[in-house]
Amino acid sequence: MNVISAFVVNKTITVNDEFNALAIAYARAANMDNQMEGAIQKLNLAKSIARDAEAIGAEMVVARYLGIADFEPTLNTFKNSADVGSRIEVKHTSWRDGHLIVKPSDRDTDLAVLVVGESPNYTIIGWIPVSIAKTPKFKSDQSNSWWVSQINLRPMDSILKGVEWSR
């Protein structure tokens, strides 16, 4: 299902997508030495896997929005490659009014896309170049990260126009 407004895109993933997301989240957790390293939220293993599965679902909806039919979530690439395509870093939060959070390890050449919601229902809010997100305007005084409010994000339809996100 795909509902597009002038500002956001609502998408739903299937039960099969949810199972795939959980399987990948489990595999990621099983291959990590320290699942909580660098995490803002310090969750137990089960909650961490569930959170990661929802983030993988967010990657799926962004890939579909961009028309990537053969999208496969990555396993153990961490920040060495993009989540979607070659330049899209997907940021997910279950908070409807949540911020897009960028960390120092995020690649400056990427475009960060904020997705909110809980599986299976997601809303793609907007995007911003990581290099712009990493400016003093968005720097958090609570952590070594940058918090971009939704009003500061570009609308999703603009990512399809004139932005070479796939290269």
Question: Which residue ranges define each predicted feature?
Answer:
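Nucleic-acid endonuclease domains
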Residues: 1-84, 91-167
